[in-house]
Amino acid sequence: MSARDGNTASEWVPTGSVTVRVPGKVNLYLDVGDRRQDGYHELTTVFHAVSLLDEVTVRTADTLSLEHVGEGADSLPTDERNLAWRAAELMAEHVGRAPDVAISIEKTIPVAGGMAGGSADAAAVLVAMNSLWELGVPRRDLHALAAQLGSDVPFALHGGTALGTGRGEELATVLTRNTFHWVLAFSPGGLSTAKVFAEIDRLRAEEDRTLPPRLESPEPVLAALASGDPAQLAPLLGNDLQPAALSLDPALRRTLRAGLDAGALAGLVSGSGPTCAFLCTSAGAAVDIGTDLAGAGVCRTVRVASGPVQGARVVPAPSTAG
């Protein structure tokens, strides 16, 4: 096959590499509706991008490849089962080219941790290929491609804080007047998003009396974010999936309790879990609480983070000027 037929990138793709940093997310509010006919659940959520970043580098290559290093790297597939791989194929298909890139991902976001690390990496691949190949695909089209890949991928492009509706892919920017400080507690294992959603369906079908009432309007959360006051935000944090995550991984109750005992304003399971996120009064308080939590024996590791931060962005190349 020659380069002239448009199916290879060899004669017109710039050489080199592009690196993109992309954040994980915490769901400050996650209202899960009933299961829809298409298998998805209707969601209303407040996404919040935090400073736990994966770094994704995309290079020109003879064929598509994928490698990981860092957090949970050994457990991740390096083929079409990986969302980052599928993102490369989708972008290439969108512009009529072969996906001839080598993808290297340095993981910091936990795998299967409820922080959308896989979605973040997919978003980063879209941004990196758009830059590497000098495509000029507009942000609106990148968002549409992201939505084809998964519900959380558009927010990884968007970043900041956003209200998500539909299955989470329809986004509206949320005004946030402050930097919020978090302690993130990683669990020894992961939780399957599909299994957590199935568990909340089961608990609801059985009318489990331990289930808390479903969340109401997100408006108080949005008002607290606009105020910039973590003490106002703390009692409003909520996650309809948390009872399902606790049902599948009861040890998370100890983690949540330990974070509050250490002085966090509030704690909740992030998304489908099992990562637990603790809101703190300040950066200094987050360091102290993280230190206490790390020594409590209730989680695998602890990270301190802040938000909101921007979504997937190209890392500027180092200056070569003398």
UniProtKB/Swiss-Prot annotation:
Organism of origin: Mycolicibacterium gilvum (strain PYR-GCK)
Protein's recorded name: 4-diphosphocytidyl-2-C-methyl-D-erythritol kinase
Function: Catalyzes the phosphorylation of the position 2 hydroxy group of 4-diphosphocytidyl-2C-methyl-D-erythritol.
Known catalytic reactions: 4-CDP-2-C-methyl-D-erythritol + ATP = 4-CDP-2-C-methyl-D-erythritol 2-phosphate + ADP + H(+)
Catalytic class of the enzyme: transferase
GO molecular-function terms, A-Z: 4-(cytidine 5'-diphospho)-2-C-methyl-D-erythritol kinase activity; ATP binding
Active site positions: 25, 152
SUPFAM superfamilies according to UniProt: GHMP Kinase, C-terminal domain, Ribosomal protein S5 domain 2-like
